[in-house]
Regions:
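Bacterial N-terminal signal peptides that target proteins for export
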Residues: 1-8
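C-terminal motif of bacterial Sec signal peptides marking the signal peptidase cleavage site
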Residues: 16-18
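Sequence/structural signature of beta-propeller domains
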Residues: 20-344
């Protein structure tokens, strides 16, 4: 097991002044000519209005049962079936971001959440037979307001709006490492295969941070006005058989950008639009995203779940926010058609 160094690592990221200081851009649903995909399901709207839903996490058990967790950052965490029905919830405070791991010993999932009400990390246990969620422990954070969060099997990474990201153990020991960015961060994901941490600095881009402490952080992808459009929000990694893909929410133009993890080459940029019968709307202003590469009978390549910041019904009437559920094959079909980029 690779251990994190006991260090404080601070660095001055590249600042894209045109993005950081320019006029704000209107939110749009889709750029002209952008590739598009549709969701096959959506969750019930969260019970709270305004900006409430935020970050999802996908749980697939060894027997193929699938449960989607999502934060309601006004009250806690909710659990949904793959069809989108709410099946459990816990009111534990303003939980902003979540991530988790499967615990083989207990045959359950452990989910960590950044709780802005208590300024803590909450750790939950989720069982799938029956489906239930319980708060098992919490630990205090020396942060002004916990915000972004991601995990590995051994560590929890949590950041605040001041650009500070800290590493903690699951039992609350830490911080054992601190990474300081120049501006606000949120989305992050751990590449457990290569021991790297990817952090989205919202108006600057995506940083790759080597967790061995020996390699300086590097800017993996910079924001611009065409591809990765700030804010940079949710991040997640899809590990395939022959290559891995980093997926990012490009919130500034309500799209998603896929990168080859090894080369940082952009594979695709796409939007999620309404189904042909408008039974499921598209997405706008997405915060959190989650991917799963676990195969099930119905979805042999896995799943993508994204938050929808402007949820509407079939008649275009506004609803509370929710999460959209997609088949990863539909996402993968948007990648470059050359065989080098396909993972079949």
């Amino acid at each position: 097991m690779n251990k994190l160094p006991y260090l404080i690592l601070s660095f001055a990221p590249l600042v894209i002044s045109a993005c950081a200081n320019g006029p704000s851009k209107p939110r749009v649903s889709m750029a002209d000519g952008m590739r598009t995909v549709t969701a096959f399901a959506e969750t019930q709207p969260v019970p709270d209005d305004d900006d409430a839903a935020d970050d999802p996490y996908i749980m697939v058990t060894p027997t193929g049962d699938t449960v989607v967790a999502g934060t309601n950052k006004r009250r806690g965490v909710e659990l949904y079936s793959l069809g989108g029905q709410r099946i459990a919830s816990i009111d534990s405070g303003r939980v902003n971001n979540i991530d988790g791991i499967y615990d083989v010993q207990s045959a359950s999932f452990r989910i960590a959440g950044s709780n802005r009400t208590t300024t803590q990390v909450d750790v939950y246990q989720v069982t799938t037979e029956p489906v239930a969620i319980s708060l098992t422990t919490s630990f205090d954070l020396p942060l002004k307001e916990p915000y972004g969060l991601c995990v590995s099997p051994t560590h929890i990474y949590v950041g605040d709006k001041d650009g500070v990201v800290q590493a903690w153990t699951w039992d609350g020991q830490g911080p054992i490492a601190t990474f300081t960015f120049e501006s606000q961060t949120e989305g992050c994901v751990v590449d457990t295969r290569n021991n790297d941490l990817y952090v989205g600095e919202e108006m600057t881009g995506i940083w790759r941070v080597a967790l061995d402490g020996e390699t300086p952080p590097s800017l993996f992808a910079a924001t611009d006005d065409q591809n990765l459009v700030g804010d940079v929000e949710g991040l997640d990694i899809y590990h395939g058989e022959s290559r891995s893909v980093l997926l990012a929410s490009s919130q500034g133009d309500s799209s998603y950008v896929a990168y080859d993890l090894a080369s940082a080459e952009q594979l695709a940029k796409f939007a999620i639009t309404s189904t042909p019968d408008d039974s499921i709307d598209g997405t706008q202003d997405t915060d959190g995203i989650a991917v799963s590469n676990t195969a099930t009978s119905a979805h042999p390549r896995g799943l993508l779940v994204v938050q929808d910041g402007f949820n509407v019904d079939q008649d275009q009437r506004a609803l509370n926010q929710n999460f959209k559920i997609l088949d990863w094959r539909d996402v993968e079909n948007q990648f470059a058609r050359d065989s080098v980029y396909r993972d079949e």
